[in-house]
Amino acid sequence: MRREIMLVLLVLLLGTAAHAFAGEAILTVKAGETLHAMSQTLYGVFFEDINHAADGGLYAELLNNRSFEQENLLDPQRFDHYTGWQFNFGGGKGKIALQEEEPLNANNPHYVRFTVSEAGYQAANAGFGASTVTGGISVKSGMTYDFYVWLRSADYTGTVTAALMDRQGTLYSDVLTFTPGEEWTRYTGLLNADVPEGTQAAYLVFTFNGTGTVDLDMASLMPADRIGSTWPGGGVRRDLTEALKALHPRFLRFPGGCVAEGSYVRSNFYNWKDTVGPVEERKENYNTWGYMQSYGLGFYEYFCLCEEIGALPLPVVHAGLLCQSREAQEAPIPMDELDAYVQDVLDLIEFARGGTDTVWGALRAEMGHPEPFDLRWLAIGNENWGDVYFKRYAVISEAVKEAWPDITTIVAAGPVADNSSAWSVIRSRYADSMVDEHYYMDSDWFPAHVSRYDSYPRTTQVFLGEYAAHEEAVSGRRPNNLYSALCEAAYLTGIERNSDVVAMCCYAPLLARSGMDQWTPDLIWFDADSVLLTPNYYIQQMFSATLGTSVVSSELSGAELYQVATRTGNCLYVKVVNLSGEPCRLTLLLDQVPDGEASLLMLSGESAAVNSFAAPETVTPVSEVRPVSAGVLTDTLPGYAAAIYSIPLE
Ligand code: AHR
């Protein structure tokens, strides 16, 4: 009775207050009326080494082109084997020569020979740029850095030192001293940084204090404070890893994107075997976004990263085809030569899951992880289409299913939202695969298509592997503004409502180093020192942190809002998005909900608002509480807002 009286009062109240709000809405939620179970792997992240996401980004290596393998077959003017290095940095006299004879190993064929004629000659690595405007490496006082370098000498007399210093030679760390021997040897040490306040970026500087010839290869500098320092690749940047973890990702899709495929020439295929084993033996390759991949963040490290951030691994392998979006490229692997590649794919699964008595399982154990990784899915192909793709997909996925029947293979549905022709092939031939959809659309497309999955047959599971709301570019870059994030939020209400058919989804791309980006928008921006979280990031985080176990009945009347209601055993989540610029008075009518307090997490602001390095908290979620009484919660949603109410059910 009390509830009925409240409702009558409420309706009267809404009537009298109508002039104050452009919108009013009543959302009736029946927590006891379950519609379907929700996918427990719905939200994840998609990592690709685009925008220097890996090298110069998540990968903890601070030196750029540490092993002189940098080259770009497509654009030789852009990079060369000396990229990132400066020679004749200080005094002394010497010559340098790029060498290939008797290298460190066959996979790491280039090194630099220093022929020093006057002691004091210096060479320096400038890192990836301490900021968007200056070169150098950002090092911090009081921090320790792990360093190593491979050296060899036949006739050198004297020592080689390594230290951090500025461009003028002011020391920023202690000095490590090595006496190179006749064989390639790895020399290691710790550098403790002491950087005066407000000074410039540092360089890692080698000083040749003797004369003669020294060969140098594979130098490395990583902050001791990183995650994964025992991984053979060396580990990942702590702040970025923590930002990923805070998204509560259920899975990690890697290593691309187009990167997983490679472009133009078959030697550019992403070969997972090149990315495992001792780090100095990994065979580098340039990536499709124009720079070199050191592979220090390789497949082993990706699997470890998954464990670190609490995500399940979702590797993508190419389907014997280079990135089809790029034209004028080498032909795919012929069908009658596919066997060797199929074996590579099976070897990858063995690497992840095989016993330590198998060849690849043994390598995994040797690298530090005897236990298998929890590999459940394998995507074969990225953005592919046509018979040329499906024929190869069929062969590879059949082989996988035969050897590992519990692994779900994922088939690509091409690069566009209008993918019905791909779906008709898939439904007729590969209905038991999961289907990877990709689409980047104007922001307004997303709310307009919130019902996209309502009509999808429930027989085949969808993986929305890449999506993002695109705004018009400003100065060449599409902004990560609040409006785009809210359009994604509106769309996610539709995804959640259809999470019986959409099993997984992830925003793309994930990371971008400021000033070194090739693609916008991106979920997380960073520079040498800081991490910038976008409004789009916060939406992903808010939705992922409040993943229900089932979708419950909800019905909206009144103003146009986007909404979904889900629940766990003891909590009801109501997600509401207001895409209009006007506030809306919202009434939640809730059954089976005790009196108490709901917590509210809300992202709102100016539609064009963005976060920037100068003002990183312009758009951040705020937490508040709202009373729930007699099954009613009333609130005023601001214009341009996404709100998530977490309402205790007991
Ligand atoms: O996410 C950026 C790129 O977009 C991916 O590499 C590719 O799959 C898509 O075209």
Region annotations inferred by a language model:
Residues 255-258, 319-320, 324, 354-388, ...:
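Active-site groove signature of glycoside hydrolases
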